[in-house]
């Protein structure tokens, strides 16, 4: 059976993730409404701006239903801002009232914009657990993981910082594999469903 994976389409790299998921063998659709969230087997939370996505989750009445689906074990993959939101704790979450809100899917503390501002964005090849050759990773105002819980597996590091993790059905990267054309990370996620 083909997994139906939703891409949270409130803000961020929606189209790129949809294409990557389809190329990786999944049925993929956008999620903007509660009915669409209820219809998917798994969810991708794309890169974008974590405080903006948090605000829109509240505005669209998706925050608590999404937290509930995650608590029930719905598989999720978060890239960049998605990694930030999947954390149990966010360092430098933003201005109170407009801060990024943790969805508490992965037992980790993530620091927003840890590698620096937009001008500090970079690309590089990194080793990734489960892949035979390095991944070309694109870091755009990227976070890094500062703390992981005992059940979290580190999948990749860059400059000695944790940039990819997995905990059960939850998977996250600080970088943007959807923009490189390399579908191996999306395939790892889809194949885990």
Swiss-Prot record:
Q: Hey, which pathway is this one from?
A: Cofactor biosynthesis; pyridoxal 5'-phosphate biosynthesis
Pfam families cross-referenced by the UniProt entry: SNO
Q: Which reaction does it catalyse?
A: aldehydo-D-ribose 5-phosphate + D-glyceraldehyde 3-phosphate + L-glutamine = pyridoxal 5'-phosphate + L-glutamate + phosphate + 3 H2O + H(+); L-glutamine + H2O = L-glutamate + NH4(+)
Cystine connections: none
Say yes or no: keyword Lyase present: yes
Catalytic residues, per the record, are 80 (nucleophile), 176 (charge relay system), 178 (charge relay system)
Q: Taxonomically, which superkingdom? A: Bacteria
Listed EC numbers: 4.3.3.6, 3.5.1.2
Q: Which GO BP terms, alphabetically? A: glutamine catabolic process; pyridoxal phosphate biosynthetic process; pyridoxine metabolic process
Q: Does the keyword Transmembrane apply?
A: no
Please provide the record's keywords in A-Z order.
Glutamine amidotransferase, Hydrolase, Lyase, Pyridoxal phosphate
Residues holding L-glutamine: 48-50, 112, 140-141
Q: Name one GO cellular component term.
A: cytosol
Entries under SUPFAM superfamilies matching the protein: Class I glutamine amidotransferase-like
Q: Which GO molecular function terms does the record list?
A: glutaminase activity; pyridoxal 5'-phosphate synthase (glutamine hydrolysing) activity
Which family does this protein fall into? Answer: Belongs to the glutaminase PdxT/SNO family.
Its job: Catalyzes the hydrolysis of glutamine to glutamate and ammonia as part of the biosynthesis of pyridoxal 5'-phosphate. The resulting ammonia molecule is channeled to the active site of PdxS.
- Subunit description: In the presence of PdxS, forms a dodecamer of heterodimers. Only shows activity in the heterodimer.
Name it. Pyridoxal 5'-phosphate synthase subunit PdxT
Q: Which organism is it from?
A: Mycolicibacterium smegmatis (strain ATCC 700084 / mc(2)155) (Mycobacterium smegmatis)
